[in-house]
Amino acid sequence: ATFTIRNNXPYTVWAAASPGGGRRLDMARIWGRTNXNFD
């Protein structure tokens, strides 16, 4: 399977809930997030 991941938000996506106050997401993590908006 091939997954194409695109960050539509105009900034780097960070996992704010990670220990240490957040870290850069790697390709192994996929968030259901579009245009940097949360529902």
From Swiss-Prot:
This protein's UniProt keywords: Antimicrobial, Disulfide bond, Fungicide, Pathogenesis-related protein, Plant defense
A Gene Ontology biological process term: killing of cells of another organism
Species this chain originates from: Hevea brasiliensis
UniProt name for this protein: Osmotin-like protein
InterPro entries in UniProt: Osmotin/thaumatin-like_sf (IPR037176)
Description of post-translational modifications: Contains intrachain disulfide bonds.
Family: Belongs to the thaumatin family.
Protein's job: May be an important antifungal protein.
